[in-house]
């Protein structure tokens, strides 16, 4: 069972700002991890409870939500959480 992966406008903007190397890494993570095992990411806490995160680089993260009823992963952000 494979999930579809969609991106918010903000995530698309974030991806455009990534280096080509990180964009390639993001594609691999989406294809091999989020679409297949979306719950393998870290469950977030606090105001982001209900969302998940996967490390893209030392400072960059992919933040997403999972919609089981639609077999959908919605990527919200793909950028740093350190002031960027």
Predicted segments with their positions:
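N-terminal functional modules and adjacent low-complexity/disordered segments of proteins
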Residues: 29, 43, 69-71
């Amino acid at each position: 069972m494979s999930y579809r992966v969609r991106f918010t406008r903000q995530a698309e903007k974030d991806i455009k700002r990534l280096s080509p190397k990180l964009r390639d890494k993001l594609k691999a993570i989406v294809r091999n991890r989020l679409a297949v095992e979306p719950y393998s990411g870290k469950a977030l806490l606090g105001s982001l409870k209900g969302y998940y995160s996967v490390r893209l680089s030392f400072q960059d993260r992919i933040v997403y939500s999972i919609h089981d009823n639609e077999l959908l992963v919605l990527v919200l952000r793909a950028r740093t959480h350190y002031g960027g």
